[in-house]
């Protein structure tokens, strides 16, 4: 939703939530965080902040530890999920550091309280940070096991009244099949929430999609690896795949 300050008339969205996977921070590596990739993402975020758009982020932890994977190897699911949440805090702190190095004031709010490294998640405080032009990174998922960071992103987007949820991936939208494995796969330009659920398309998990559907929150799936794509989406360029109501799709 528009903030108290003057909004940028060029931007389609005035308040966004950008969802990054933990893997997005790895770059070409197989584990951990790539400083080069982190810097590139930080500059992408800064480009949008410079437009006057309010930016919140949620980051996964799969580059460090994935709770579901730990559970399949015999770990207790709740314990594994909490470990995954801690991984998201590490990623959030890394991105905060990268953003502040280029002059973007940033706050990390964690759903699991750890006062030495992050603020506790307080919805009203998060909104106030956004209104003051600060980037807010939501860490530790929802703070509960069995919920993905995609669901956390949907929840936080609703709580802060974001105009859109931007789902950053390594491909330029949603396809009928994995384009890396199937050259004949075709990209969807627009999808309804029901299409995503019925076709079991790998946009986000069903809980996250249902939450967005119930609250009319549009989702844009796009390629983060192309520098400048976040800005393009915010300015309304038709890239990636938009998920929303059928009426919006057919407009």
From Swiss-Prot:
Pfam family, one: AA_kinase
Protein name stated in the entry: Uridylate kinase
Binding positions (ATP): 19-22, 62, 66, 169, 175, 178
GO molecular function terms listed in the Swiss-Prot or TrEMBL record: ATP binding; UMP kinase activity
Subunit structure: Homohexamer.
EC id: 2.7.4.22
Gene name in the database record: pyrH
Biological process, per Gene Ontology: 'de novo' CTP biosynthetic process; UDP biosynthetic process
Leading EC class: transferase
Biological role stated in the UniProt entry: Catalyzes the reversible phosphorylation of UMP to UDP.
Organism the protein comes from: Anaeromyxobacter dehalogenans (strain 2CP-C)
GO CC entries: cytoplasm
Keywords: ATP-binding, Cytoplasm, Kinase, Nucleotide-binding, Pyrimidine biosynthesis, Transferase
